[in-house]
Amino acid sequence: MALPSRILLWKLVLLQSSAVLLHSGSSVPAAAGSSVVSESAVSWEAGARAVLRCQSPRMVWTQDRLHDRQRVLHWDLRGPGGGPARRLLDLYSAGEQRVYEARDRGRLELSASAFDDGNFSLLIRAVEETDAGLYTCNLHHHYCHLYESLAVRLEVTDGPPATPAYWDGEKEVLAVARGAPALLTCVNRGHVWTDRHVEEAQQVVHWDRQPPGVPHDRADRLLDLYASGERRAYGPLFLRDRVAVGADAFERGDFSLRIEPLEVADEGTYSCHLHHHYCGLHERRVFHLTVAEPHAEPPPRGSPGNGSSHSGAPGPDPTLARGHNVINVIVPESRAHFFQQLGYVLATLLLFILLLVTVLLAARRRRGGYEYSDQKSGKSKGKDVNLAEFAVAAGDQMLYRSEDIQLDYKNNILKERAELAHSPLPAKYIDLDKGFRKENCK
């Protein structure tokens, strides 16, 4: 008889669970994290130490020392007459189960795979009169600092109830006959309750900075912090050496940014981003930082000046406005920019070489043309000789020699020589027939 009764009991449990799930509106997993945005305006004097507060206890990771006991389920009962609730049992994600009262051992049961499938329902094998009251299913996540609760009211009747389960507008109400089994449904299949990940690898904190006039989507990254201990620093060099976050930030949940000493150029909007992907935490805090000029300290009253006991140094001119400090930041060029400039230089050099070769070829061709024209003119002069030109030249010479040059000579000898020189040469007579006659005589 034990086996059929056990089969009948589990059939009843499955029937009640399928009926109750239709009325359980709280079985939908709640949001594990909320997006919180806080915005504040802060101001410090230049040279002071600025601290931008960014704290969150939900980002503390040291509670992972609990290993797999950071997720726990509690079932509590508050009687019909009110009064404080009493703890019935606990179930840890490692599988450890604890029942507080001896009378409930073996009578109250939970599924051993509750933290795997998200079914945290409580089974009461045989309902008694003292079991009536308000039951609460409490889920705690110590690591993510999450708390979720679900309430179910149990009514015990003498006979079979007319309505086994219904919804009263706030919670589920379950009516069960005395001695019958009861299943108090509590289902939450959120990944934060059913999955286990490496939490340290899913926590990261970012600090961003927006200079004045720069939109949020073009903000500069200052710091990256990881729960594993890795840190990355970005941003301009003049600011990188003056900002810091505590080394024990993830141990205390304090990610406040310290800037020391503060300069006028540090003005802008700073954002602290907290991300915990495992716990579903995404927070962003915004700080509008303004930097004021430091107040000038008054000179001591006893300082000498212009022979008097009071300071005679002229005070600052109120009409002159103090300018802001200008810091030139030289950003190193990338390798791609270097190759681009090198390409420009090589292209310019190649163009210059081509231009030089073109000029040389043109000059050489022009020089060859001149030589060819000179050779051609020389040949033409050697072939065509005009004897008339020579005759004219000889006549000119004779006319030149026949000119009467009036010279004053010291003696007659010189005068005669000069006349002989200017007189035309006597024509030479050549007897052509003489040679012919000699040949005939032979």
UniProtKB/Swiss-Prot annotation:
Chain positions of motif RGD: 252-254
Tissue note: Detected in endothelial cells in mammary tissue, in both large vessels (left internal mammary artery) and small capillaries (vasa vasorum of the adventitia).
Induction: Up-regulated in vein endothelial cells (HUVECs) in response to VEGF signaling.
Region Disordered, residue ranges: 294-318
GO cellular component, one term: endoplasmic reticulum lumen
Membrane topology, record value: Single-pass type I membrane protein
Sequence intervals crossing the membrane: 342-362
Main location: membrane
Keywords associated with the record: Cell adhesion, Cell junction, Cell membrane, Cell projection, Cytoplasm, Disulfide bond, Glycoprotein, Host-virus interaction, Immunoglobulin domain, Membrane, Nucleus, Phosphoprotein, Repeat, Signal, Tight junction, Transmembrane, Transmembrane helix
Glycosylation positions in this chain: 119, 306
Localization in the cell: Cell membrane; Cell junction, Tight junction; Cytoplasm; Cell projection, Cilium membrane
Site (Cleavage): 325-326
Biological process, per Gene Ontology: cell adhesion; cell differentiation; establishment of glial blood-brain barrier
Pfam families: V-set
UniProt cross-references to SMART domains, sorted A to Z: IG, IGv
Domain of life: Eukaryota
Modified residues (Phosphoserine): 228
Secretion signal span: 1-19
Record remark: domains: The RGD motif is involved in integrin ITGAV:ITGB3 binding.
Subunit composition and interactions: Homodimer in cis. Does not appear to form trans-homodimers. Interacts with ITGB3; the interaction inhibits ITGAV:ITGB3 heterodimer formation.
Function: Transmembrane protein which can modulate activity of various signaling pathways, probably via binding to integrin ITGAV:ITGB3. Mediates heterophilic cell-cell interactions in vitro. Inhibits osteoclastogenesis downstream of TNFSF11/RANKL and CSF1, where it may function by attenuating signaling via integrin ITGB3 and MAP kinase p38. Plays a role in cartilage formation where it promotes proliferation and maturation of growth plate chondrocytes. Stimulates formation of primary cilia in chondrocytes. (Microbial infection) Contributes to arthritogenic alphavirus pathogenesis and acts as a receptor for these viruses.
Name of the protein in its database record: Matrix remodeling-associated protein 8
Provenance organism: Homo sapiens
Gene: MXRA8
